[in-house]
Amino acid sequence: MTDFIGKTHRQIITFNKDLGHSYTPNLNARLIDENGGYFIKTNSSGFRSNIEFKNKKEKKRILFFGDSNTAADGVSNNDRYSDLLGKYFDAEVFNYAISGTGTDQQYLTWKKYAKEVQADLIIIGSLVENIERNKVQFRETVDYFTKK
């Protein structure tokens, strides 16, 4: 069951004292876009996932860190490149990506949430734009759809 239907991904972001912002925990939502919309679900830690992340490893595991490209804004959880790679390699996927983050926040995410998690591979999806995010002390956010 979907908790709510929204028109902006700002409705799924919340303040996080360690990272600046993260996804709202325990969310089940449909976001509407120009293609009709997509579904997202977050776990209790506030990461886009249909499962809770646990340390005990039962098969190959890949951890993903990144910004909106790795979090996959505009795409349902199961259609993200991280999840498709997990299916292809028969691996468990923990996607720690958060929209709008730089590599500094991604490092903090690893340090706080994933440092003790057993993994076979860690993938960091980084864009040149992330370097600019790291350099600024304050960055105003603008929603992609509403431009506000």
Where would I find each of the regions flagged by the language model?
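Interaction-surface signature
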Residues: M1-P25, D104-K148
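Short, solvent-exposed loop/turn segments at secondary-structure junctions
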Residues: N69-A71, S99-T101, L127-I131
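A conserved hydrophobic secondary-structure block that centers on an alpha-helix together
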Residues: G86-Y107, K112-K115
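Glutamate identity and glutamate-enriched acidic tracts
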Residues: E34, E52, E58, E92, ...
